[in-house]
C-alpha cells in the first residue's frame, strides 16, 4: 500500500503533459505588459508627430506674414486644429493655450571683402518660433513604470520670415 502513492508521485514527476500551459501562464503577464508598452509608446510617438506637424504648419503660415505677431492667434489655431477657426483638434489632449509664438532677429552683416551679406535678405533677419509643451495623458502605463502619470511633449519649429 505504501508503494502505490510513491509510484504515483514518480509518474507525476515524469509526466510532461501541461508543461506548455504552465510556461505560457508564467510568460503571459510579461507579454501583455510588453504589448501594452508598445501600444503606449506608439501612441505617444504618434501624438508627438502630429504636434510637430501642426507646429510646422503654423510656423510656415507666420513666415509668410510681414508682421507675424499680428497673426499669432490664427497660427495657434492652425497648429492645434489644422485650420484657422477649426473645431476638431489634431490631438484631443493638446490645446491652443499650450502653443507659444515668438519672433527673434539675427544680424545679417555685410562681409567687407565681398560686399555681400552673410545670408540673403535684409539686416536683421526675423525668425519665427512656434513652440509647445503639451501633456500626454497616456493610458496609465507610464505611471506603472514610474515615469509619472503623464508625459511632457516639448517641441518647436522655426522658420525665417520672408513676408508676402
Which role does the model predict for each range below?
Residues 2-81:
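Alpha-helical assembly-interface signal, strongest on the long, hydrophobic N-terminal helix that forms
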Residues 2-3, 48, 56-164:
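Short, conserved structural patches
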Amino acid at each position: 500500500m505504501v508503494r502505490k502513492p510513491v509510484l504515483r508521485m514518480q509518474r507525476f514527476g515524469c509526466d510532461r503533459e501541461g508543461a506548455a500551459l504552465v510556461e505560457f501562464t508564467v510568460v503571459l503577464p510579461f507579454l501583455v505588459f510588453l504589448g501594452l508598452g508598445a501600444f503606449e509608446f506608439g501612441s505617444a510617438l504618434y501624438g508627438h508627430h502630429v504636434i510637430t506637424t501642426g507646429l510646422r504648419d503654423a510656423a510656415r503660415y507666420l513666415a509668410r506674414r510681414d508682421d507675424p505677431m499680428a497673426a499669432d492667434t490664427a497660427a495657434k489655431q492652425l497648429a492645434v486644429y489644422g485650420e484657422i477657426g477649426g473645431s476638431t483638434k489634431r490631438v484631443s489632449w493638446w490645446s491652443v493655450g499650450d502653443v507659444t509664438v515668438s519672433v527673434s532677429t539675427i544680424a545679417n552683416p555685410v562681409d567687407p571683402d565681398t560686399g555681400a551679406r552673410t545670408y540673403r535678405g535684409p539686416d536683421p533677419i526675423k525668425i519665427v518660433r512656434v513652440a509647445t509643451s503639451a501633456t500626454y495623458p497616456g493610458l496609465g502605463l507610464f505611471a506603472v513604470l514610474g515615469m509619472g502619470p503623464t508625459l511632457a511633449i516639448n517641441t518647436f519649429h522655426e522658420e525665417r520670415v520672408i513676408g508676402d
